[in-house]
Amino acid sequence: MTISDKIRIYELSRDLNLENKDILDAAQKLSISVKSHSSSISAEEAKKIKNLINKKNSDKKILSINKPSIKKDNFKQNKSPSISSKKETPLKDNSNKKPLLIKPLNKPESVKIISNQLQNSNKPNIVNTSQSRANLTNTNINSKTSQNLNQDKKTFENNITPPIKSPAKPPIQLIAKPKNINNNVKSNESSQNISSAGDNRRLSNKPDQNTNKPKTKNYDSKIKTPELVGAPIRREDPKINPNKQNNKQNIAFKQTGSNRIGSPNRPGMPNNRPGLRNKPSDQGRPGSFNRQGNPNRPGMPNNRPGLRNKPSDQGRHGSFNRQGNPNRPGMPNNRPGSKFNGQNSSGIRKPVSPNELLQLQKNNNSEKDNKDKNNNAKQNINGPNQKAKAPNMRPNATPSSKKPPHRAFSNSSKKPGKTDWDDSAKLEALRSKNPQKQRQKVHIIGENDDSLTSETSGYSGEKISILSASLARPKKEKSEETKSQKSIKQFKKKKKETTRQRQKRRAMELKAAKEAKQVRPEMIIVPEDNLTVQELADKLSLESSEIIKSLFFKGITATVTQSLDLATIETVAEEFGVPVLQDDIQEAAEKTVDMIESDDIDNLIRRPPVITVMGHVDHGKTSLLDSIRESRVASGEAGGITQHIGAYQVEFEHESQKKKLTFLDTPGHEAFTAMRARGTKVTDVAVLVVAADDGCRPQTLEAISHARAAKVPIVVAINKIDKEGASPDRVKQELSEKDLIAEDWGGDTVMVPVSAIKKQNIDKLLEMILLVSEVEDLQANPDRFAKGTVIEAHLDKAKGPVATLLVQNGTLKSGDVLAAGSVLGKIRAMVDEHGNRIKEAGPSFPVEALGFSEVPTAGDEFEVYPDEKAGRAIVGERATDARATKLAQQMASRRVSLSSLSTQANDGELKELNLILKADVQGSVEAILGSLEQLPKNEVQVRVLFSAPGEITETDIDLAAASGSVIIGFNTSLASGAKRAADANDVDIREYEVIYKLLEDIQLAMEGLLEPDLVEESLGQAEVRATFSVGKGAIAGCYIQTGKLQRNCSLRVIRSEKVIFEGNLDSLKRAKDDVKEVNTGFECGVGCDKFSSWIEGDVIEAFKFVTKKRTLSQ
């Protein structure tokens, strides 16, 4: 098909005079793929769309025929006869018919009125299409109606109850009671409406006899399935009583149950409207629609107590039941201009339609309820003196001047035939094709409708009691339903709140019980040096509110999701008694690389065990190792503490055989955590040294966690048993709380009490170490390239980069090319712990190696490669990763948070202390950097611009001079020319040998950058005992009670315990002489330039401001 055969959507909409969305909707229903109004479709598809739209237009034409046939012009014409009939009716007839108020059923005139009405109503004057449609059934219905009317007259006269037959003396008390009066008025109305109601019901139950239209069956089939619910209607039993007399008697009572008049017969409309109920134009045609809430079911009487049938809407041609205003059976449509209204006006003034009563019309179509209501109605028909129930009483209401268009019309100036009815009819017709369940609409009648006056109710000139609208509405049903709904809502709401509160209480109880049962963890691990408040609370088994409260008291405002740095985490954890371990340190303690490979299995031999000595500082680790080595290493260490990892190999004779043991001595100071972790990473057996007089300390617990992370056995050496106050059992008790139970207590942990100074039980300790190592079955393959770990590394000014290596597998030889991390090296020389040069080193042998291109990182694994090319390729990849990691660390260190920015904005520019750090070995650099991170940084920030192992060079001096930094040297020396360059550039160089002193000086330097605080210092107190006027001012004669007064000091005047003045003391005299100060017990004169209102009894407090040095803790 060519493009010329294509048609666009907007062209088709223009041809059909429709909107684009209508065409798109039609295309969607026909499953034609279109996207927008500019989409193209084929001519065949366009034809399908046109057919569908033409079909819809044909349905709309049917709806336009079914509109209300009475137009405004016709309505005006129909209105005049009712007015004329009203005027022509003589008022004197009311006096003759006044007894009808009490017993209207006994008067035959009521039947005559009905017959006259029916005769007069046989003069139709229907306009437009309603006439042609009414003629279809009028011929059949009129004959049937006349027969039924004659039968109704006879039946009505024969079935009048005897108590109603006394017309002479109407009881006066019934006039005063609104219920009986209304009941009588209803009975009078029933005499006028009985024939139309009865015939209407009978004809509606026999649609096939009255019309030959096949659409009536369609209506019956549609109505016989009452799926929908509607307004509460008091109906009779759905089975019509074959005894028509009793049936009519019931109908008469039900119609007299409220002050309603029958359906008005408008002039020009046929009176036999009951026959028009089954017309296909209204009930059977596709365009008609009965509201979902109230279907007219055949066989079900539409006469509820107190409500008349409404034949006007059922029989009117072209009428339809709008959803907002359904045709409810028994609801009259009192339209102005009705001929019947003219008849009624001759005897009784027309009461207003009960549609306007204030009530909620709700659904009640159960047959059981209808039977109960009908039985109540039959009991009420026994006589007019019997009281009727309140729900059946319908008072006359004043018609409101303005009513919603969906209500029934009363005798007011409101005209029917609103245009919005036509639109709703089209909507309902479309919905009737695809019926679906619709939400029931409840409409509330206007509040003005329940105002009752004597002008609209009862006989003319007669006083009548007014019934309140609250009594007229169906109390029982409405109140019970509303009350039940409210009670259910209240119950549900109360239940929901109670459940929430109960769940909250249970959760709190569970948490309290959990906290009571939980024990604080031995140690927490901090991943990546930060944790959120919630994560820290979970690790500490605490509520997050406890962490936030602890931080608040420290001056830190935090939320649950805020991240905390390592220093803050350690501070909070220490408050709750839990030590902190960094995650990278934990990972450093784990053995990540398996030194034994599958190719080594055939050549494995036993190797010496590697033993790491660990414990708290000053617990005697190095002294114990000295006793084993029979040397004096500890005495030669700075400050008497170990600040390096020492690697030693010892020969020990066991069972007539010489055994080699390799010992690693780790620092016990808290700053050397990373060193301890590296020690456990390469160890085979961990020796935990605990002082018998000190017990378990934080570093002891940390060492235990390292050993467990490395999954190595632990041998406990309880040292210093020779000291006073030593208690080995107390140490065992504390260790048992950490799941280290001694063998003599039934556990599996070897514990040996020793004395390093007196060398007690040293041999026993070595035997236990060998026994444990034999159980581990330690093996290695010496016939391969060496693999191992860098224990320590430093830069020697004479030798260059030097690394302490521990060979774990294979044999390391001079001249081997090795890669340690991202550093490539070729072994030039190897030295053992005694300083002797060796050619090769086997498994478990520690050596110092020279020949690296730069200082390797302590803790890295090294491996020997066959040639330099292979090693360089590996090093290049590792160097790239190392640079990325270093850059990420630098970016993290420069990270600025909003809190730090706000601090700088409030307190001015943040002060910084720039440092350049040089140390002897890499481990010392790590320890110092870790300690600096833990210093308070609220007001002073420490920035380490450069840190490396090695001596201080001129390059370091130049960098310090350019950045204003201080150079920190730790166990290192100055290169040649560095001292002269430092003096020339005025660079401060500080050298330290002990880490304690280094950290103290840095903290003092940070405090020196803080501005001092001004603190008030009290000088003395004096009392005013006399006042003297001098010129414009006044002098206070004072007596010094305590301290002294100084000239130009600050003072405050206190009167009646309130400060009334604060300023400077400008004049101080003793007798007539000016003095600088006056001490306690003397009198003096005090004068202030800005204060002269002295009164005897005033107290003068003298003080001055002094500066106080601030500390970082503040």
UniProtKB/Swiss-Prot annotation:
Organism (species): Prochlorococcus marinus (strain MIT 9301)
Cellular localization per UniProt: Cytoplasm
Compositional bias segments (type: Basic residues): 489-505
Identify the PROSITE patterns for this entry.
G_TR_2, IF2
Domain tr-type G residues, every copy: 606-778
| Encoding gene (name) | infB
The residues forming a coiled coil are none
User: HAMAP family in the record, alphabetically?
Assistant: IF_2_B
Region annotated G2 sits at 640-644
Which portions of the sequence form the region G4? 719-722
Where does the record place the region G3?
665-668
* Residue span of region G5: 755-757
Gene Ontology, cellular component aspect: cytosol
- Residue positions binding GTP: 615-622, 665-669, 719-722
MF annotations from Gene Ontology: GTP binding; GTPase activity; translation initiation factor activity
Protein name (record)? Translation initiation factor IF-2
- Composition bias of kind Polar residues appears in 181-198, 252-261
Keywords from the named record: Cytoplasm, GTP-binding, Initiation factor, Nucleotide-binding, Protein biosynthesis
Q: Where is the composition biased (Basic and acidic residues)?
A: 85-96, 365-375, 417-431
User: Would I find Cell wall biogenesis/degradation among this entry's keywords?
Assistant: no
User: Where is the stretch described as G1?
Assistant: 615-622
Q: Does the keyword Cytoplasm apply?
A: yes
Q: Can you tell me which family this protein belongs to?
A: Belongs to the TRAFAC class translation factor GTPase superfamily. Classic translation factor GTPase family. IF-2 subfamily.
Q: What does this protein do?
A: One of the essential components for the initiation of protein synthesis. Protects formylmethionyl-tRNA from spontaneous hydrolysis and promotes its binding to the 30S ribosomal subunits. Also involved in the hydrolysis of GTP during the formation of the 70S ribosomal complex.
Q: Where is this region: Disordered?
A: 69-102, 181-507
Compositional bias per record (Low complexity), positions renumbered to this chain? 240-251, 262-278, 290-309, 321-337, 376-385
